[in-house]
A protein has these predicted regions:
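Gly/Ser-rich catalytic/binding loops embedded in alpha/beta enzyme cores
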Residues: 1-68, 179, 314
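Glycine-rich, small-residue loops and helix-cap segments
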Residues: 10-19, 116, 122, 247-351
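Charged, often glycine-rich, active-site loop that binds/positions anionic groups
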Residues: 31-39, 196-214
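Structural signature of FAD isoalloxazine-binding scaffolds in flavoprotein oxidoreductases
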Residues: 72-78
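A short helix-breaking turn/cap at a secondary-structure junction
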Residues: 81-172, 224, 346-351
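Short helix-loop capping/hinge segments that flank enzyme active sites or metal/cofactor-binding pockets
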Residues: 147, 205-263, 267, 312-322
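Acyltransferase
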Residues: 163-188, 219-226, 252-273
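Short connector loops at secondary-structure junctions
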Residues: 182-202
Length: 351
């Protein structure tokens, strides 16, 4: 049967061309999908097939989910735009279950405007996830509006980021500064400084929450496979999967409390025209298909559940690289307006 978002797309007249690939169960053996710009490189993951299909021009729009970095990272590698609205703004019924409070539904598209149109439609037609508010804002993309302040939130990932990517990111920020946008370092402001300090802990909290919330149905499937091997899953995914679900209730409660505090710190940074920015990945697509790349730049936003967009505004070594912007809870329209302004004003760098 269709997931809620696929059902809504069909009702809206979308032509569903087919299913796309992803790493086994979202975290195991990567799929055979290759990068549309270099077949010897990874498309990223876990929404690898969706990103590759959009990046190759096979489809204008595809859907995916993100628990850690599964939308914006593959979009970065494949030259697509990825829009992850806030957690729960789009119904995720039928997506396979697990990681209930970490998983976000999002859209990959050729343009930011298309990503908005589809995401906004899904939030209304499929509805928000039970207990959550849907996306606010116009059904069509909002008017472009240049951001006022962009805060670099790169502390956790900068030392992991290759020199060419650092140079491309700095050059884009220099261009934005020349256009009148204030560029600030996280350590210059109290709230962003606290966020930057807590990013490593955010990754740990994400892992604990994922482990605890994966007990069903993931662990059930893998225990059945272990008891009576059917060949349904690779040894890699069974071994790694059974290591999940070991988080204790106390550890889970601690991670949830950390997330609440992290969200409060993030919300304290809210200001008109202010957004956080990072590269979408630590470099261009990795060689081979066994490595889907680092999710370091998605740790904070995946834990907090705030809206994020990745725009293919940079290139390194002839390969696309995304520029990621983070907004605030309920601020999808504000984030999209800023993204559209950047996409229009800096299209020359678009891959």
């Amino acid at each position: 049967r269709d997931a809620a978002i696929v059902h809504a797309l069909r009702k809206g007249g979308a032509v569903i061309l087919g299913k796309t690939t992803l790493p086994e169960l979202g975290f195991g053996q990567p799929a055979a999908t290759t990068n549309p710009w270099d077949a010897g490189r990874s498309p990223g993951g876990s929404s690898s097939g969706s990103a590759a299909a959009v990046g190759a021009g096979m489809v204008p729009v595809a859907i995916g989910t993100q628990g850690k970095g599964s939308l914006t990272r593959p979009a970065s590698f494949c030259g697509a735009c990825a829009f992850k609205p806030g957690h729960g703004t789009i119904h995720r019924g039928g997506d396979g279950g697990g990681q209930e409070t970490n998983t976000h539904v999002g859209v990959l598209a050729h343009t930011a405007g298309d990503a908005w149109t589809v995401a906004r439609y899904l939030s209304e037609a499929a509805g928000s996830h039970p207990g959550h508010r849907g996306m606010e804002g116009p059904k069509e993309p909002p008017p472009a509006l240049m951001p006022k302040i962009l805060v670099r939130l790169t502390a956790a990932g900068w030392d992991r980021t290759d020199a060419a990517t650092q140079t491309a990111f700095d050059a884009l920020l220099d261009g934005l500064a020349g256009a009148g946008v204030t560029i600030a370092e996280a350590d210059e402001l109290p709230g962003p400084r606290a966020l930057a300090r807590d990013l490593e802990a955010a990754a740990q909290a994400l892992d604990v929450i994922a482990d605890y919330e994966s007990r069903w149905p993931l662990i059930m499937y893998l225990e059945q496979e272990n008891a009576a091997p059917t060949g349904a899953y690779s040894e890699r995914v069974v071994t790694r999967g059974l290591q999940r679900g070991r988080a204790t209730r106390a550890e889970y409660h601690e991670a949830l409390a950390f997330r609440d505090a992290f969200r409060a710190t993030l919300d304290s940074c809210r200001a008109d025209g202010l957004f956080f920015v990072t590269p979408s990945a630590t470099g261009p697509a990795p060689q081979g298909t066994g490595d889907t790349g680092s999710s370091v730049y998605q740790w904070g936003s995946s834990l907090a559940g705030n809206p994020v967009i990745s725009l293919p505004l940079m290139a390194v070594d002839g390969l696309p690289l995304g520029f990621e912007m983070q907004g605030f809870a309920g601020g999808e329209a504000d984030l999209m307006a800023a993204a559209l302004a950047l996409d229009e004003g800096f299209a020359a760098g678009r891959y």
